[in-house]
Amino acid sequence: MLLEPGRGCCALAILLAIVDIQSGGCINITSSASQEGTRLNLICTVWHKKEEAEGFVVFLCKDRSGDCSPETSLKQLRLKRDPGIDGVGEISSQLMFTISQVTPLHSGTYQCCARSQKSGIRLQGHFFSILFTETGNYTVTGLKQRQHLEFSHNEGTLSSGFLQEKVWVMLVTSLVALQAL
């Protein structure tokens, strides 16, 4: 039997509020690029709560589809908790890898990743590619190009979908359970 119209809407509103609260606490990783003259900046941004920063390592790998780790990375950043930041729910930490002049050696597949040494959480960003062409130009595919360094939670290529999938599974399961009442 289906829920009464008023009860179903109320239950759905409560579930959506729960999902919104939980997804705001998720740790996400995004990848982006910006070009400044001949320089190309590859940027890995991790969104997290300030208390989650301790023990987190953000790293960028090239051509490492199966074994991207801090040990095999091009560059890594160890996050530290900033006690000076109060009242902030979610903050971002960025790792920037700068290529001064893109050459054929830079062609390849890149990936931003992060790992927590405390909680065992591992985030893997989407793969993106740099292709150096014969004319001396290059293209970056798989993410959005940026002309200047501005980041917001809604931009970039959202990648750590595991926690978001768990939230959606919880939402669907809850709706099915409510319909069974």
Swiss-Prot record:
The record's Gene Ontology cellular component field reads: extracellular region; plasma membrane; side of membrane
Is Disulfide bond included in the keywords of this UniProt record?
yes
Highest taxon above the source species: Eukaryota
Signal peptide as annotated in the record: 1-24
Name of the protein described by the UniProt record: CD160 antigen
Upper taxonomic lineage: Eukaryota, Metazoa, Chordata, Craniata, Vertebrata
Subunit structure comment from the entry: Homomultimer; disulfide-linked. Interacts with HLA-G. Interacts with HLA-A2-B2M in complex with an HIV-derived peptide. Interacts with TNFRSF14 (via cysteine-rich domain 1); this interaction is direct. Interacts with LCK and CD247/CD3 zeta chain.
**Boundaries of each Ig-like V-type domain copy?**
25-133
Attached carbohydrates are found at: 28, 137
GO MF annotation terms = activating MHC class I receptor activity; kinase binding; MHC class I protein complex binding; MHC class I receptor activity; MHC class Ib receptor activity; signaling receptor binding
Q: Which UniProt keywords apply?
A: Adaptive immunity, Angiogenesis, Cell membrane, Disulfide bond, Glycoprotein, GPI-anchor, Immunity, Immunoglobulin domain, Innate immunity, Lipoprotein, Membrane, Receptor, Secreted, Signal
Q: Among the record's GO biological process terms, what is one?
A: positive regulation of type II interferon production
In which tissues does this protein get expressed? Expression is restricted to functional NK and cytotoxic T lymphocytes. Expressed in viral-specific effector memory and terminally differentiated effector memory CD8+ T cells. Expressed in memory and activated CD4+ T cell subsets (at protein level). Expressed at high levels in intraepithelial lymphocytes (at protein level). Expressed in both alpha-beta and gamma-delta CD8+ T cell subsets (at protein level). Expressed in umbilical vein endothelial cells (at protein level). Expressed in monocytes and at lower levels in B cells.
Annotated PANTHER family = CD160 ANTIGEN
Q: What organism is this sequence from?
A: Homo sapiens
